[in-house]
Amino acid sequence: MKKCMNNSDDFVDESLKGIYKAYPSFYEAGCDDIRAFVHPGKAKGKVSIVTGGGYGHIPVFLGYVGEGLCDGAAVGNVFTSPSSEAILNTTRAVENENGVLYLFG
């Protein structure tokens, strides 16, 4: 089986960079942190929602981010929880006057 990556240490960041380039109007790096995956524009009139987790075999948490869904996802390494810095930067990128709800499992 072939691996489709350059370097395992850079796998998550390179994957995220590819997603940002492929869908620039749907996703962006919050607070200049590539691991703070957010939907552009702060939600108005609702509580912001942040989720996240390890990257795993598929970027499952990224699929929860979008209009009418979660406002951001903090991304960790493969099978590793996101860092507190990634969670904080995701929070800062999506926070508004209505607060932030966290959905981590």
What are these regions (language model features)?
Residues 23, 52-54, 72-73, 104-105:
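Fold-independent oxyanion-binding glycine-rich loops
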Residues 6-14, 44, 56, 60, ...:
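Conserved active-site and cofactor/substrate-binding residues in soluble primary-metabolism enzymes
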Residues 57, 64-98:
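Glycine-rich oxoanion-binding loops at beta->alpha junctions
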